[in-house]
Every structure is written in C-alpha cells, then in structure tokens.
Amino acid sequence: MAILTREQFRSIAENKSGTRGLKGFVNENRTFSKSTAKTSIFLSHSHFDKDVVEQAKIFFENLGINIYVDWADQTMPEKTDGVTAQKIKNQIISINDKFVLLATNHAVVSKWCNWEVGIADPFKLPHKKFVIFPLADNSGSWKGNEYLQIYPRIEKNNRYAGGEGYYVWYPDGTWDTIEEWLNK
C-alpha cells in the first residue's frame, strides 16, 4: 500500500486529462447527471488545495463519478455563514451518495474539513460510503495518521487480485477495489 504524494497524484490526473490539461476543470460546466453517473461524491477538501481538487475531479470523473465541490456551487453565499453550513450539511447527508475527504496536510487541520467529517461520519461510515484519500506532501510527510486508524482510505497498490490499482482499505484489514466501493 502506498499513500500517494501530491506530485504522483498530479501526474495521474495529468495522464487522465489528456490534452485537456488540469486548470479550470472544476469550474467548467461539464458534470454528470445523477442518471448517468454511477454515484456522486461530496469532496471535502481545504481551499488551500484547489490544484489538488482539480486533479481529484479528473480522477473521479474518469471513473464515471459526479463530484460536488462547494466553491464551484453557484448557489453558495459569497461569504461563509449559517446558510453555507446548512447547504454543505444537506449536500453531505442527503444529496451526495458518498463522502471523500481529500486528506492533505492542509485538510487534516482545517476546521471546515473536520466539521464535514463529523457530519458525514454517522450518516456515511456505517454504510461504507465514507473514505479518506490521503495525499502526502512531495517529501512524503503526512500529518493525518490517526485518520488511518479509524477510517477507510484510498491507496494505490499492486500486490492484490486485479494487480496494480486503487483500493479502499478498511480499518479491519479488508479491502475493495475503488470500482467495487463506488458501486456499493
């Protein structure tokens, strides 16, 4: 198992985007409808990681998944307030099927990301609809080790059935391919 670095993830997204490139991908009006996407994901992330959010959108959309990113939602208030919190809570609990924390070093210390994890935990975790996607700094350091002990996580692996790919690892030691998890 391997936690990807930001640079490795950028390279993966760049390969998946082809000639399209990585910039502006979140703000473009190219989304999957609920009827055509396998599932939809609320992507919890730090706003300091907009570059990685672009890459995550490419990564998941190449799997046929619709991604919700709060700052790309035109219905959100300009300044965060109670309406913002209520809209995010509704997106996590009612509208999106799954929850993914893009767990960069910025995200694991973000008050908003930790609040979103607290909202998603009781609604998504019992149904295996909650994962973290840890991304280490390019030096390989990652601050969220306690998350690995209690939450399922996405990692790259090449040692199990199906060969190299992305797997969801559960705290009890079991795993699914990312495709299996997305189809649950």
PLM regions: where:
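Hydrophobic beta-strand scaffold positions of dinucleotide-using enzymes
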Residues: 100-102
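Conserved BB-loop
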Residues: 64-89
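Short beta-alpha junction loops
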Residues: 73-75, 105-106, 132-141
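A short helix->loop->beta-strand "cap" motif at the edges of active sites that frequently abuts
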Residues: 124-130
